[in-house]
Structure formats: structure tokens, C-alpha cells
Amino acid sequence: HDRRSPRARFGGSHDYEYSVAPLMGGLILVVGQWREIFWAIAAMSLISLLGTLFLIPESLPQERRHAGGFRTFLHNAGTLLRRRLFVAYMLVNAFSAFALMAYVSASSFVVQEMLGFTSTQYSVSFAINSTGMMAAAFLSARLTRTIHPRRIMRVALAVVSLASFALLIGSLFFDTPAWIVLPAFFFTVAPQGMIFGNGAAMASEQAREFAGTGSAMLGLGFSFSASLAAPLVGIAGTHSSLPMAITMVVGSLISIGCFVLAGRHTPSAQRA
């Protein structure tokens, strides 16, 4: 399973951004206004663009690259969409992102408007959860040396589902108390570090000859599902956590369903 470890470690380094970003945003608001946050985002985006253009070499060997432009991409994408294992793991990641984006979109309203936390306290809470996701990704990278990724994903998906249901119960019957909300947030967010990297690695194994197309489709599925979650969580306004909890439960359950389907189409010798 060593081939999967680098992707998990890369995911962990990516999760580091989620830990630092809210703290940076809180510091910017202390000395400036919300407009300065967007200037900071623009500056970092420009740095990323320049780094991509001039510092990061193409990692795919020349002999494995495909010519033909968008038409070739569509052909390769169609081929991958007929591979059930690729689609299943792509959807596992996509609906895990659906649940995660529900948290990202609505947690500030829940924590600040409903629980009464300050913006700085919320930023610290968000950073703690993101640090948990980063730590989970790095732990997963080590575990994959001896444990099959499906076993790791199975546990992580179960934890996310239980935490989402705990949040739903807290929203329905306990008026969204902090003693339920904060732990539920942590155990919804942190295990994602064990899901995204492993899910992407399992999907990529089904797209070895179309590595670029497979990566693009994984990113597209992730971004599209995340964009669907964002407007749903605000349906009841800023004083109800119920839409967020329902969205998180739905995302976690569909993700588990896709994971189960992936297991049914996995050769018995490769099952965890």
C-alpha cells in the first residue's frame, strides 16, 4: 500500500491550510476590515499561480501524456465513468465533501450566533477541527503501510456518520448545546483526513492510464458537491442548525452507500 501513502501525506499538508486560514482571517479582522481578507486571498492566489507556472514541473512523464485537447478529455472521462469502482470512490469523496462543506458554510453562524462565541473563539475552534483533519491524514499515511485503505475508510466514514447523527439529535431535541455541537463538529471534520486521500488513491488506481483526467474528475466531483451543500444549510436562516445537520447526515449516508457499492465491485482478493 506504499503507493497510496504519498497521496495521503499530500492530503495532510493540504489540510494544514484549513488550520492556518481561520486564524489568519481572525488576525486580519483585528487590524483591518473584511475587504482586506479578499485582498489577502487575491495575493495568495497570485503567488500560487506564479509558483505553478514557473516553479512546479509537470509530474506526468511525456510518454504518458495525451494529446487531442478537450475532445480527448471527454473521451477519457466517458471511459472512466463506465468504471464502477472509479465512480464509486469518486462519489465517496464527493459526498464526504458535501458533508464537510455543510460544516464550513454554516458552522460560523451556529458557533457565533447560536452559541455566542466570538469570532476569535470560532477561529480557534475551526483551527482545532482542521488540525484534527490534518493529523488524521498523516496518521492514515502511516497506517496504510500495514492496513488496507478500505479498513481505514470504513472506520472514518462510520465516525463521521455517528457525529452527524449526534448533531442532528442535538438540533432536534436539545436546542443545539455546545457540549454536543463542538465534539460533533470535531468528529465530523477530523476523520475526513482519512477519507479524502484514501478515496482518491483508490479511485486513481482505476485511472492509471488517464491520470490527469481522473484527477480532474475527482476535483470536479468534490467541488460540485461542495457547491450544492453551501446554499442548503442556510434555508432556515442563521438561527437554526437543523438544515446543516440534515445536510451532513445525508452526505455521510450517501458516502457510506457508495463505499459499500465499491466493496461489492472490488475483487475478493483486494477487499479489506
Model-derived features with residue positions:
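Interfacial helix-cap and linker-helix signal at transmembrane-aqueous boundaries
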Residues: 24-32, 111-112, 143-144, 232-240
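Helix-to-loop junctions at the C-terminal end of transmembrane segments
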Residues: 136-151
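Juxtamembrane intracellular "pre-TM" segments in multi-pass secondary transporters
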Residues: 57-90
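Helix-loop-helix hairpin linking two adjacent transmembrane segments in secondary transporters
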Residues: 9-56, 60, 124
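Helix-loop junctions on the cytosolic side of multi-pass membrane transporters
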Residues: 51-66, 262-271
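A late C-terminal transmembrane helix in Major Facilitator Superfamily
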Residues: 200-240, 247-248
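Pair of pore-lining "gating" transmembrane helices in MFS-fold secondary transporters
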Residues: 82-100, 186, 190
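C-terminal transmembrane helical hairpin of 12-TM major facilitator-type secondary transporters
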Residues: 151-198
